[in-house]
């Protein structure tokens, strides 16, 4: 083999390597050897600065002094001692060494590995990367490269001709992305990977979608013409073409090797799809029982401006080596146009390369000129090889250009005139490569013409099939595979009383098992007293508090074969030290999970996340997309912090099914409640979630219709039993919907907040509205009715009892969206003598449920057309931060609540 030898063939340490530099028989030989070694290190660390990686030659090429021979007292043509371990014996003089290093690090591909901590990884990477210059593609590989380039160019040209004003975000100037993807797919199949999950933005997405991932071109053209991507009878609003997804099986090596590729849906919120793709990959690995990542690979494609500018990229990279989120490494390809809309690199980042973002996790970085598709093909193979060996992320920075503006109707010369003068003079990458291999006699002009005409004819034929008289929808794939047997909610009958109960005897066993530990496992004494023993004492009274109900819900689902994954900050213990799914041995820090040791069919995955909301929630959403057989739960430390993940809520959780027909049963737990903790620890902003609900405010015939058309469920439960049923309902249904829970804080230990196990027995179900237990038997005497939701009920109940307001009924709305019209009507009918109605909430008037419930009460029910608001006045912040004022507000709220 010609090339630089491995630093660490036998996993030598730095010390042993350094020692070999100095241990020679001759001082002069030792000096030369050390100097050459330092020169090699200089090229490896700084050669990238001088590399020819920018096809537009806009990036300054910097020749570091560390590449100068004079710095090491070396001269051109100098002989090399044969005792130098790092240099192959075929390289006998310094000129050969320099030529080798120049080709490896200063040509149209370069690398940065110096920041990597692992000596073994660096040694492997240096050896493999330096070998690439002597690995020339075969004739068939070159033809394959050309065909991928030409197919991309033909697609862009066809679209420009047929739809000249359509914003397709074409790949012209970076067609080598297609070469990279093809190489990654092939190498994945060769390595017996079963799945590649792709998260990518708009640039080049349509090229990949149609020309490589087999999305039917006729369906695509039909959509571009303004038609729906959904066949008749499918409920959904759809999305733009640059967000469309596809799954396909790709065959290679004469159909001897294959890989399943999933290009998942994305929003235009750049990089938000990254953690979604990672989460879906993790779920695939879980179901394949190969958590090491040996069978499923995540491929993320990025734009150069977005990867440097969007914080979710850093959040996602930070997850890459955490045990609860590790997916065995991800291959990143940056489709680098050297511009973001109109933002030039000097305004878009503070470092030289957009790929520098990967250095903080020690990711290898390979930068390649997009005009060198053969190099692109080679480094893409190397990326998969590295990922398979070391199970870590690796980044390819593919530097090209963008032929048009951000979209095809944009004029880029308004802001980048000289850049686009350069671009418009350039031969396209496909045509340049075609000229190259035609000159090599590998492909003829006639073959190129025939291939081009064939591909154009295929697109034209598909275009004709997209006309109204010819078009037929391809089979929909949204409820196939693991999701077969489920339905869209529009097809459900009334499931408002769906039985979600479970055997009382088994629930008691689960609750007992939830605090059972091995005999040699020492639990903290205070925890043993206040948690474990307290739970067992409650069970003797047939009672369960909030955390016990949660354990019973999770445990019973596991008994039925469902898996449960709960993720978030401190979820193993719980923010309020209430959950303790993880117990810690006091002498060894060993973790024990009782629910995973009770012999259930399903598994519980408890993931204490890092301090991220956005990426982690997106990750869990992605996890939820893979299978309906896992209950995915994400809990915020406090509900207030959910706005750190607002993009995830808006673009994925509440709208994903409507846009993309992808169901998710994710549960989002948001501790909420006004207890004097101030603006950052009081409110999950209920009002914002309710504003996202797509349920009708008026013209509603019955609750069945509402359940059929809702995009998610929002509940504010006030009893452990109702929380128990809500969690189980998520899995017992034959469809999946996101569930947002305004969860409790003080109710976790409130003496009156408990449920009996009989309330969770077979035949019981989630109660959308809870009747007033204190007035249900004397309803005719009630003159005033309070409607409320959440923990404020307990304050109102206590005040009513203390002040003997016996003519007031208090009705709890446990489910706010979809709005339980019929159940509310039943309660109104129950109190037929009531003449006054009020909505009472602890939130401010411009928060909480009021803006959502007001039009529904006033327009649906004649009796409540004059319903009164009782609560805090409007506030700019979510809560008062002055404790004395908070206490006064609580007192005033209770006074007002019973004086209307």
Swiss-Prot record:
UniProt key word Transcription regulation: no
Molecular-function GO term, any one: oxoglutarate dehydrogenase (succinyl-transferring) activity
EC number of this enzyme: 1.2.4.-
One Pfam family hit: OxoGdeHyase_C
Catalytic activity: N(6)-[(R)-lipoyl]-L-lysyl-[protein] + 2-oxoadipate + H(+) = N(6)-[(R)-S(8)-glutaryldihydrolipoyl]-L-lysyl-[protein] + CO2
GO cellular component annotations of the record: mitochondrion
Cell compartments where the protein resides: Mitochondrion
Keyword Mitochondrion: yes
Cofactor(s) the protein requires to work: thiamine diphosphate
UniProt-listed CDD domains: TPP_E1_OGDC_like
Chief location category: mitochondrion
Origin superkingdom: Eukaryota
Any single GO BP term: glycolytic process
SMART domains tied to this protein: Transket_pyr
InterPro entries membership: 2oxoglutarate_DH_E1, DH_E1, KGD_C_sf, ODO-1/KGD_C, THDP-binding, Transketolase-like_Pyr-bd
Keywords: Glycolysis, Mitochondrion, Oxidoreductase, Thiamine pyrophosphate, Transit peptide
Membership in a protein family: Belongs to the alpha-ketoglutarate dehydrogenase family.
The protein's role, per its UniProt record: 2-oxoadipate dehydrogenase (E1a) component of the 2-oxoadipate dehydrogenase complex (OADHC). Participates in the first step, rate limiting for the overall conversion of 2-oxoadipate (alpha-ketoadipate) to glutaryl-CoA and CO(2) catalyzed by the whole OADHC. Catalyzes the irreversible decarboxylation of 2-oxoadipate via the thiamine diphosphate (ThDP) cofactor and subsequent transfer of the decarboxylated acyl intermediate on an oxidized dihydrolipoyl group that is covalently amidated to the E2 enzyme (dihydrolipoyllysine-residue succinyltransferase or DLST).
Protein name: Probable 2-oxoadipate dehydrogenase complex component E1 homolog
Organism: Dictyostelium discoideum (Social amoeba)
Lineage of the organism: Eukaryota, Amoebozoa, Evosea, Eumycetozoa, Dictyostelia
